[in-house]
Amino acid sequence: MEVQESGCDPSESGAQEPSPVPSKTAGHYELPWVEKYRPLKLNEIVGNEDTVSRLEVFAREGNVPNIIIAGPPGTGKTTSILCLARALLGPALKDAVLELNASNDRGIDVVRNKIKMFAQQKVTLPKGRHKIIILDEADSMTDGAQQALRRTMEIYSKTTRFALACNASDKIIEPIQSRCAVLRYTKLTDAQVLTRLMNVIEKEKVPYTDDGLEAIIFTAQGDMRQALNNLQSTFSGFGYINSENVFKVCDEPHPLLVKEMIQHCVDANIDEAYKILAHLWHLGYSPEDVIGNIFRVCKTFPMAEYLKLEFIKEIGYTHMKVAEGVNSLLQMAGLLARLCQKTMAPVAS
């Protein structure tokens, strides 16, 4: 979603702020909204409708294969597996599910001890139902642990099913992939994130402005967990959701400043563009944050298509140089110079 240019200075709020932080009683514990509003049923999950519908078929028919769900963070991979387990096992969920985070428990000992012991346990379940072992962030497991897991999956295939969630399925060894149904999740769209945010805002009675919601969606980049965390953090800190407060909490280069910098490049005004870059640099933002936001703003910036293609090519080239650790401020200043050069009228010979 494009961040609208409101014509006001980024440091100014778009609306009058009410009284700050909502009052909370001493010792009151606020459950994170990510957990409070975590879906409990498959039909409550936002986005990835085709993949979720396959899981609903598994839940109805009962005989689930081993599954791998791969996709970006915050798209509902672990939640989908938990909803599937809840639909399949019902009241037996507590006894028949083992949940492990493979980024902590990543060694071969975990497969030999925890997983093997759970797979050997006897649990009475209805026909066509199996115990479920959930391995979150399975792409963090060592190769040795994955090799050991392959044999365990074969031995206990009559009683136990494995559900793996990971960001990159190519980090799971081929023998495990061939034993599983691989489901792929994609980033959520801005509209899907907005729908869920509005649902939470209504229930929590959160005051907001449209530019505040756009700022949350801009910073989340299709990650629902990030969006809800940013919403709750802004509400807890300021009691009001507007773009100024959101960017204070998220502490990213403000897109209106970045937009202004790109506009100066389009106008071939390198001096003004560099002033904004130097300002962002002195605020302490990392080069990756600055270059990433330049790219995200450039994608929706109103300019000629051929010029946008040239800009994105130069931004990508500079990002590569910055990632290699080459003097970052110099590289970004060079980027501004090249962007200005793209828009300058050719000099008559």
UniProtKB/Swiss-Prot annotation:
The name of this protein is: Replication factor C subunit 2
User: Region Disordered: which residues?
Assistant: 1-27
Q: Recorded GO terms, molecular function?
A: ATP binding; ATP hydrolysis activity; DNA binding; DNA clamp loader activity; enzyme binding; single-stranded DNA helicase activity
Species whose genome carries this gene = Mus musculus
Q: Which gene encodes it?
A: Rfc2
N-acetylmethionine: residues carrying this PTM: M1
Chain sites annotated for binding ATP: G71, P72, P73, G74, T75, G76, K77, T78
**Which residues carry the post-translational modification N6-acetyllysine, per the record?**
K158, K299
Q: What does this protein do?
A: Subunit of the replication factor C (RFC) complex which acts during elongation of primed DNA templates by DNA polymerases delta and epsilon, and is necessary for ATP-dependent loading of proliferating cell nuclear antigen (PCNA) onto primed DNA. This subunit binds ATP.
Give a yes or no for keyword Nucleotide-binding in this entry: yes
Report the main location listed first in the record: nucleus
